[in-house]
Every structure is written in C-alpha cells, then in structure tokens.
C-alpha cells in the first residue's frame, strides 16, 4: 500500500465518528442522551483538533514556518476543554461553534503549508467540509432537542 492510500485510510477513518454520532443522534435522540453521544462528539472533536494542531506543528517545522498557528490551536482547544469541564451551564451549542471555528482556522493555516501537495489539499478540503456539516448537524440537534 502506498503512502497516499495509507493517509487516505487514516484521514477518512477519523471522520467516521464525526458522521455516525450526528446520524445516530438525529435518528434516536433517546440513544443520544442515554449514551452521552453529545459529550462523545465533543470529546472526539477536541481530540481530533488537538491531533491536527500537532500535525500542523510538524508541517510548520518542516516548512521552516512559524508554529504560532499550532500554539493558538492548542491553547484554544485546552481552554475550550476547561470551559466544557467546569461550566455549570449548558454551553454545548457555543462550544460546538467554537470547535467549528477552530477547524476552520486549522484548515486555513494548513492550506498555506501544503500548497504543493494537491492530492492532500483535496483530502483536507473534503474532510474539513464534512466536519463542518457534522458540527452544524450536532448544533441543530442540540438546539432542536433542548
């Protein structure tokens, strides 16, 4: 298996929970609430954003660019994690929207670093687009079922 195929498999495998959780939540809200699927979605999204910040860090170093974008993402994800953990109120829609903005920032930061890799740029576009839709679906689900 060539490197491009391995990267595609890993990239799209990471997308599976982003897709399945909103689908299950919309089909059966009871399952979503009984099995804490909203929290699972948050957790998965935060883990993936952290992972993407790490890959952005590596790409920045390899390209001899500033690691400021990665640092901003790590800080944002960390602060959002603390906010989710310690907030007494239900700010899930706000937190999902912030995560959506973090993924946008990751995409635009990474896009500059992968200019010469067209096949990977295409994958990142499809993944980020899908992640946007999934976050919007979860925001809609939470808004509808409050």
Stretches with model-predicted labels:
Residues 1-14:
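N-terminal membrane topogenic signal
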Residues 1-2, 29-38, 53-65, 90, ...:
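Short juxtamembrane and helix-loop transition motifs at transmembrane-helix boundaries
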Residues 13-19, 40-86:
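Core segments of alpha-helical transmembrane spans in multipass integral membrane proteins
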Residues 18-28, 109:
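Alpha-helical transmembrane segments of multi-pass membrane proteins
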Residues 24-25, 80-89, 141-142:
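Hydrophobic alpha-helical transmembrane segments
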Residues 44, 94-105:
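Hydrophobic core segments of alpha-helical transmembrane domains in multi-pass membrane proteins
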Residues 88-96, 107-122:
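Membrane-helix boundary connector in multi-pass membrane proteins
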Residues 124-145:
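Final/C-terminal transmembrane alpha-helix of multipass membrane proteins
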